[in-house]
Amino acid sequence: AIGQTPFTPNLSAMYGLSRALDVLLEEGMENVFGRHATIAQFTRDGVRELGLELLVSDEAYASNTVTAIKVPEGVDQKALMGKMRTEHNVVLAGGQGHMSADIFRIGHLGAVAKDDIAEVMEALKIVLPEVGFKG
């Protein structure tokens, strides 16, 4: 029938989406974009301070939602990600496709604060030398 869904819609998802959109509009889209740009820059700066190399070094092309970092020579990416998760409760994403073992990623989309990223950086300071980082 016209105006009807062909099956029972997921009302919880609809209500969740409605609330999420309200939150975005309350904050203001320009503020949301600015917050993401700020936390992304904070993340990239922290990565550089650790002596790590960003996959995308040109700020004009860097993402404001996720930061990709090259796995340093001699570092076991799986060990890095495993120790971060099990010992520091920090989940890093690996690369995808042909870069699956070459990079790891730090996500900073949504409700991610500077304190959250600072915790990630502190954990990386501890774990990186344990998995072969010589920087």
Predicted regions and their residues:
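Short glycine-rich or small-residue beta-strand-to-loop segments that form or flank ligand, phosphate
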Residues: L24, V66-A68, R105-G110
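Active-site C-terminal subdomain of aminotransferase-like
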Residues: A1-D45, E49
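PLP-dependent enzyme catalytic core of the Aspartate aminotransferase-like
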Residues: H98, D102-G135
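A common structural junction motif
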Residues: M84-L92, K125-V131
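Conserved PLP-binding catalytic core of the aspartate aminotransferase-like
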Residues: E53-E87
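Flexible, glycine/charged-enriched surface loops at secondary-structure junctions
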Residues: E27-R35, G51-D58, G95-Q96, G132-G135
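Short amphipathic beta-strand starts and helix->beta connectors
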Residues: V47-E53, E87-L92
